[in-house]
């Protein structure tokens, strides 16, 4: 299947990262929380998989389309 990057839907700040490398996640599991325009947006896993890479850290600023987490 290959690795699938989970990207930021909008620019914002990472308030929290809920997963670590090696975690097994189900579709819909919250991977991280992105604050944009004073709203907290939970970023869900698009599919079942394993966390291959966590690109962002808490407090990081991201742009729209930036990779947050990579699922395998």
Can you say where each PLM-predicted feature lies in the sequence?
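Structured functional modules or segments
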Residues: 1-72
């Amino acid at each position: 299947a290959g690795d699938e990057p989970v990207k930021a839907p909008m620019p914002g700040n990472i308030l929290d990262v809920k997963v670590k490398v090696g975690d097994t996640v189900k579709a819909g599991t919250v991977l991280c929380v992105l604050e944009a325009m004073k709203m907290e947006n939970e970023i869900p896993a698009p599919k079942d998989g394993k966390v291959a890479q966590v690109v962002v850290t808490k407090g990081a600023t991201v742009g729209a389309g930036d990779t947050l987490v990579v699922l395998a």
